[in-house]
């Protein structure tokens, strides 16, 4: 990861519930001016977001960046497709992983580092319903153990 002050704008908490995270990458975003200003106000949502590789480039879809309230006619489309900036080597690696059955690219969080907007992209495999139940059961068991340890002392 890059050094510097990190200000988190948005986080996709549901992704860790719906997917097994295999690997993560940090990517830059190609944005318009009003999008950057909206991000500085914290108006972003990664809930239904996903990424696709098209013609050797990575694009992120369904990332909602709210309109900038002080821009008049020059505002952006909140759900427009945005290009991600990755190295050619990283794109080839991602392409190889995503072509395997069950893998997809999921954005985990969006943040600023040294004034530049970045996105953490994960190679993830979808969980089935019983996997989700299993992780919920493990979390509850861990919580019960922690509670018992606390009460024991």
Please place each PLM-identified region on the residue numbering.
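Broad gene-expression machinery/nucleic-acid interaction feature
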Residues: 26, 31, 46-48, 81, ...
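Beta-rich strand-turn-strand
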Residues: 86-122, 126-128
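Intrinsically disordered, Lys/Arg-rich N-terminal extensions and targeting peptides
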Residues: 1-32, 136-153
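C-terminal end-helix/capping segment
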Residues: 79, 86-92, 126-153
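N-terminal first-folded block
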Residues: 16-47, 51-59, 63
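Helix-adjacent hinge/juxtasegments
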Residues: 52-94
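Short solvent-exposed loop/turn micro-motifs enriched in small/polar/acidic residues
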Residues: 22, 43-44, 77, 101-104
